[in-house]
Amino acid sequence: MNIQWILSDKIKRAMIAAGAEQNAEPLVRQSGKPQFGDYQANGIMGAAKKLGLNPREFAQKVLEQVDLSDIAEKTEIAGPGFINIFLNKNWVAQQADTALNTPNFGIKTAHPQTVVIDYSSPNVAKEMHVGHLRSTIIGDAVARALEFMGNHVIRANHVGDWGTQFGMLIAYLEKMENEHADAMQLSDLEAFYRAAKETYDNDEEFAVKARSYVVKLQSGDEYCRTMWKKLVDMTMQQNQRNYERLNVTLTEKDVMGESLYNPMLPAIVEDLKKQGLAVEDDGALVVYLDEFKNKDGDPMGVIVQKKDGGFLYTTTDIAAAKYRYHTLHADRALVFSDTRQSQHMQQAWLITRKAGYVPDSFSLEHHNFGMMLGKDGKPFKTRSGGTVKLADLLDEAVERATLLINEKNTALSEQEKAAVIEAVAIGSVKYADLSKNRTTDYVFDWDNMLSFEGNTAPYMQYAYTRIRSIFNKTDVNPTALSAAHIEIRNDKERALAIKLLQFEEAVQTVAKDGTPHILCNYLYELAGVFSSFYEHCPILNAEEPVKLSRLKLAKLTEKTLKQGLDLLGIKTVEKM
């Protein structure tokens, strides 16, 4: 149930019937203040201006053409030409009943698409650090939202599994195996990488072997490929533990590393040359883009093949876009990476389109995000200034949540307490990030994120358990409850029912724009509206028809909160 879409469709048809152009947009939005209705159509003035008409007169014409009798109890023209729409409470009650009794609340996209989502993308032989958190959890929330709406989602974990460093890493893995080292030493990937680099820098014989392994690996040598695969597998096994702790849906099957595109690169570069897009410059192959200027105001050069024959990230990203369209048959490809990658992605995709590798209808979207900062406003680091490992961050979250929950509640069993601690710990880290507009930097603050007040995971999780507890206190017959209907008798019930019906609008925005904070804001507002309803509308002490109706509103709120948090990858618990 997407009220915004229903109203937009009806008002757009009426605008066209009243003389507006076919592409006129009604710009229907949720109203910010009750006196202006539940929804407003703000596109009337723009359409009237194009027609040379008085906006209020045109608004009147539109209202004469539109039939909202089943949906709205009244409409009014406000200000210079806004249309305010007040929803009919009986229609709202019926829609809320339908949402409660329909799988997925009846939410389903009319036009399912195949969507590739490129997210997380850690490097092989290195441990995941806090810098991987945002891509991993934002990408996953968007993947869940798109899937929930009925799209076919292909997760693409674009891991850094290729490059000259692999000669060094293979040679060091071989050295360790020859020395019969315990495989457990590889549990610390950072130490492994550092030791390999140190050996490479200080042992010329080792360095010669490492360089020879680079060449062998790139030419498909079986031994080097086997050793390389071991490194990839060991890394991804460790990453998988992080994904599982984070309640992220990525698996080893979703790995589509840089190496996947290697076979495509020579042909792409050759084709760019043939088309005259890539030209030789000082031995390298460069594509000059008029759309980007260097500091002298000349077209910017983007290297696609180095002087030594090596390929670059740009070449790989061109290949990835081509692969996602031609091989995966995607309609959209979304990449979740740091804002600092924005120009790089724009250039790679511009070359992709200039070369004709994908049609204009194929949507290539870079969903960029800002940095995670410490309280000092600088990039988040350890006290000694080092990179914070993701596993260490999650461990600290559990330690802090343990102290918090032990202070709050001793009535839980040990098993229940462990579940609450894990849900609150991981949920707090994720929600603190997901609730911020992804395009901005944000300050990582343990005290704020673990608070039971405000727009936080603990507050949302507690709101859910409070509603669950209502059903533990009632002896209402489940058959009687399912047979009952929602009836709206006052403004608090009406406000809650309308807010519940706006769930799809929030999910749809996340799916379209890659903005999970919209869903967080919606859930927080829903919890607030429910709290006000609960305060003013007694449930358990109400008379039977009223009690059943209010219980159904509470049940729909419970389901919506649980589903909404699940789309964010945040666990709920039955008791807190």
UniProtKB/Swiss-Prot annotation:
MF-aspect GO terms: arginine-tRNA ligase activity; ATP binding
GO biological process: arginyl-tRNA aminoacylation
Principal cellular location given in the protein's record: cytoplasm
E.C. number: 6.1.1.19
Organism superkingdom: Bacteria
Span(s) of short sequence motif 'HIGH' region: 122-132
Catalyzed reactions: tRNA(Arg) + L-arginine + ATP = L-arginyl-tRNA(Arg) + AMP + diphosphate
InterPro entries per record: aa-tRNA-synth_I_CS (IPR001412), Arg-tRNA-ligase (IPR001278), Arg-tRNA-synth_N (IPR005148), Arg-tRNA-synth_N_sf (IPR036695), ArgRS_core (IPR035684), DALR_anticod-bd (IPR008909), Rossmann-like_a/b/a_fold (IPR014729), tRNAsynth_Ia_anticodon-bd (IPR009080)
Keywords: Aminoacyl-tRNA synthetase, ATP-binding, Cytoplasm, Ligase, Nucleotide-binding, Protein biosynthesis
UniProt keyword Amino-acid biosynthesis, yes or no: no
HAMAP family: Arg_tRNA_synth
Protein's recorded name: Arginine--tRNA ligase
Species of origin: Mannheimia succiniciproducens (strain KCTC 0769BP / MBEL55E)
Gene name, Swiss-Prot/TrEMBL: argS
